[in-house]
From Swiss-Prot:
Quaternary data: Interacts with nAChRs containing alpha-4:beta-2 (CHRNA4:CHRNB2) and alpha-7 (CHRNA7) subunits. Interacts with CHRNA4 probably in the endoplasmic reticulum prior to nAChR pentameric assembly. Interacts with KCNA2/Potassium voltage-gated channel subfamily A member 2.
Gene it is expressed from: LYNX1
GO biological process, one term: synaptic transmission, cholinergic
PANTHER family in the cross-refs: LY-6_NEUROTOXIN-LIKE PROTEIN 1, UPAR/LY6 DOMAIN-CONTAINING PROTEIN
Source species: Saimiri boliviensis boliviensis (Bolivian squirrel monkey)
Keywords: Cell membrane, Cell projection, Disulfide bond, Endoplasmic reticulum, Glycoprotein, GPI-anchor, Lipoprotein, Membrane, Signal
Protein name: Ly-6/neurotoxin-like protein 1
Annotated GO CC locations: dendrite; endoplasmic reticulum; plasma membrane; side of membrane; synapse
UPAR/Ly6 domain boundaries: 21-105
Topology in membrane: Lipid-anchor; GPI-anchor
Length: 116
């Protein structure tokens, strides 16, 4: 019995401890926001969502989420939006993690079309 208990304790000590993910968590009307925060243990992703009200006015939201689905353009809502996800500490702090300018062209066209 003692060798089995010793083996169990050695195996238990060898397990890596789960570390919580650090993400920026904030909501800001403008280009970007930074507010580092330790996420709860069950969180697997840092998420950044940008909602475009007009081609020059947007809202940035950053959060900790347990699951994440990236989108380039969400055409189901009134305003265009993009969502990006990442899985390492403070990975959602980049200045502009959304798709490149060329990829934003359909969003801008849809926004302009909606204004007509």
């Amino acid at each position: 019995m003692t060798p089995l208990l010793t083996l169990f304790l050695v195996a238990l000590i060898g397990l890596p401890l789960a570390q919580a993910l650090d993400c920026h968590v904030c909501a800001y009307n403008g280009d970007n926001c930074f507010n580092p925060m330790r996420c709860p243990a069950m969180v697997a992703y840092c998420m950044t969502t940008r909602t475009y009200y007009t081609p020059t006015r947007m809202k940035v939201s950053k959060s900790c989420v347990p699951s994440c689905f990236e989108t380039v353009y969400d055409g189901y809502s009134k305003h265009a939006s993009t969502t990006s996800c990442c899985q390492y500490d403070l990975c959602n702090g980049a200045g502009f993690a959304a798709p490149a300018t060329l990829a934003l062209a359909p969003i801008l066209l849809a926004t302009l079309w909606g204004l007509l």
